[in-house]
């Protein structure tokens, strides 16, 4: 049985609660051995947005179909952005913090245009919210100057399992993130053709692992990961 296409049901529920500007958020590249982790954000007016035919979780779409949907998604959205965290950043701070870094970069970009009040995040773990630092949480009035909030700190974030398959704004974000990250890997493949990144996009195929074993890792590989 074919899966039902994503809808705006959840976004419209949020609009009814007063959250008009809703952002869908999804990541790609989490499991890759090379390249960035990338986070797409698509902001819509949940009270007035129409359904967008053809959009679904990026993993369910062929590459040319994803590419063809990008202009329609960009026109449909009130604002959109894709943020990235590099392989070196993943090695330096770990995957969850790198996801947060990429996500806050995307949110900062859309927030320069307008500030969403609510973020729907695919999955069951909120890696996007900025962790509260205890010294800030318990600081008294004499604790010194106020700390600048990180981008996105003022937004409500709600996780939803399989949101990329059920929430249209999240599915749209997944398409933008996938297309942009794929294009980055195809471009990098011109410098490093031996790894087949134009095909595997940095993921852990047998051929990719064999190429790493034969040629060694590049600066675009996640060196703290098991690569071979």
Language-model features: locations:
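RNase H-like, Mg2+-dependent phosphodiesterase core
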Residues: 1-228
């Amino acid at each position: 049985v074919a899966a039902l296409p994503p809808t705006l049901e959840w976004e419209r529920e949020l609009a009814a609660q007063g959250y008009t500007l809703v952002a869908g958020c999804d990541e790609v590249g989490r499991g890759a051995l090379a390249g960035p982790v990338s986070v797409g954000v698509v902001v819509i007016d949940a009270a007035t947005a129409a359904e967008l035919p053809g959009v679904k979780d990026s993993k369910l779409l062929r590459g040319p179909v994803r590419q063809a949907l990008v202009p329609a998604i960009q026109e449909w959205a009130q604002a959109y952005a894709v943020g990235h965290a590099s392989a070196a950043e993943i090695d330096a701070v770990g995957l969850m913090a790198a996801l947060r870094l990429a996500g806050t970069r995307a949110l900062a970009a859309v927030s320069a245009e307008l500030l969403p009040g609510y973020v729907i995040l695919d999955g069951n773990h909120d890696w996007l919210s900025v962790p509260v630092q205890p010294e800030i949480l318990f600081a008294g009035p004499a604790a010194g100057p106020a700390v600048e909030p990180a981008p996105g700190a003022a937004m409500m974030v709600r996780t939803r399992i399989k949101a990329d398959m059920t929430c249209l704004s999240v599915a749209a974000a997944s398409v933008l993130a996938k297309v942009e990250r794929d294009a980055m890997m195809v471009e990098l493949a011109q410098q490093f053709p031996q790894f087949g990144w134009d095909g595997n996009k940095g993921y852990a195929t047998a051929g990719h692992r064999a190429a790493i074993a034969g040629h060694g890792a590049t600066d675009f590989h996640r060196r703290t990961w098991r690569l071979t």
